[in-house]
Amino acid sequence: MATKTLDQDPNKQRPGAAVSSVLKPLNAEYGKVAPGWGTTVLMGVFMALFAVFLVIILELYNASVLLDGVPVSWQSVQS
């Protein structure tokens, strides 16, 4: 069985230590809730815009909205 001895040098930083030290303060706020509505209104605006985007895509897919100059028949797709 192949085994490998790892250096146990306490002064040597592991590869992800820099990222860990940057992200640790963000995790310190875990579970705390800011008073008030915060960014809920902004989230609602983005959800509404995304819903409008989905409706537009659905209408284009169902050919409810026809674009001028864009062929919508399968015959134009075939070579």
From Swiss-Prot:
What membrane topology was assigned to this protein in its record?
A: Single-pass membrane protein
Which parts of the sequence carry Phosphothreonine? 3, 5
Query: Which InterPro entries does the entry link to?
Result: PSII_PsbH (IPR001056), PSII_PsbH_sf (IPR036863)
Q: How is it modified after translation?
A: Phosphorylation is a light-dependent reaction catalyzed by a membrane-bound kinase; phosphorylation occurs on Thr residue(s) in the N-terminus of the protein.
Q: Name one GO biological process term.
A: photosynthesis
One GO term in the molecular function aspect is: phosphate ion binding
Name the major location. plastid
- One term under GO cellular component: chloroplast thylakoid membrane
Keyword Zinc in the entry? The reply is: no
**Transmembrane intervals:** 41-61
Which UniProt key words apply to this protein?
Answer: Chloroplast, Membrane, Phosphoprotein, Photosynthesis, Photosystem II, Plastid, Thylakoid, Transmembrane, Transmembrane helix
Q: Where is the signal peptide?
A: none
Annotated compartments = Plastid, Chloroplast thylakoid membrane
State the family it belongs to. Answer: Belongs to the PsbH family.
The UniProt subunit note reads as follows: PSII is composed of 1 copy each of membrane proteins PsbA, PsbB, PsbC, PsbD, PsbE, PsbF, PsbH, PsbI, PsbJ, PsbK, PsbL, PsbM, PsbT, PsbX, PsbY, PsbZ, Psb30/Ycf12, at least 3 peripheral proteins of the oxygen-evolving complex and a large number of cofactors. It forms dimeric complexes.
Q: What does this protein do?
A: One of the components of the core complex of photosystem II (PSII), required for its stability and/or assembly. PSII is a light-driven water:plastoquinone oxidoreductase that uses light energy to abstract electrons from H(2)O, generating O(2) and a proton gradient subsequently used for ATP formation. It consists of a core antenna complex that captures photons, and an electron transfer chain that converts photonic excitation into a charge separation.
* Protein name in UniProt: Photosystem II reaction center protein H
- Mind giving the lineage of the organism this protein is from? Eukaryota, Viridiplantae, Streptophyta, Klebsormidiophyceae, Klebsormidiales
